[in-house]
Amino acid sequence: MTGRTHMAVGAAVAVAAGLAAARLADPSAASASLASVGDASLSPAAFLSLAAAGAAGGLLPDTDVSTSEASQELGRAWAALVALIALSLALYTAGVTPAGQDPFVALRWLASQLGPNHLAGAMTLVAVCAVGRASGHRGFSHSLVALVATYAALRLALPALAVPLALGYASHLALDLLNKTPLRLLWPLRRGVCLGLLRSAGMADGLVLGLALLALLCSFARGVLGIVLPWPPGLPTWS
């Protein structure tokens, strides 16, 4: 599957899980029919957070190759951070910063918000990505061990977004299982597994992408705007 398909499916899965959790948390909504309840259950900010986290999780496994979209995006983020630090140092050493103003004020504030758990989680996540890169494409980073390790790291680093990120990660593994190229899902076992049903960047890839985007649109209309969507007659409802 292409990177954009992994992002769309990861976002759709994370938003669907968020809607289900919000529905179960509301007794009145949980006891009503899926076809009749149209009240909004997610704020726009929550929807965007879930979608972004799911999309990011959907790209994480492909950080094991330098040509992947995820790896390129991470490289840009690291480059931006290095550029920011370099600019701060340049301003400090050149004396351009006004007297009494700390050129590292933004970085110091960010560091003050980070506790030991956040740092430990971030370091664990970096280690998972490093092992994945060392093991090659569709190796460690495409395994159940990596999924569990990533979730554990995210629980420390970003507890509020750990579940949608992990769901996006899991959706990536599920999609890649449908591909014709094996992945080492049961790492450290060397044998790869695949179902061989789909081809990356083929017609099926475009179909999956379209369905994921449609699911996101429907989730936004129903979960955020509270629009009751037409329900085909004869289909079962959740009650």
Residue ranges and their predicted role:
Residues 1-239:
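N-terminal membrane-targeting hydrophobic helices
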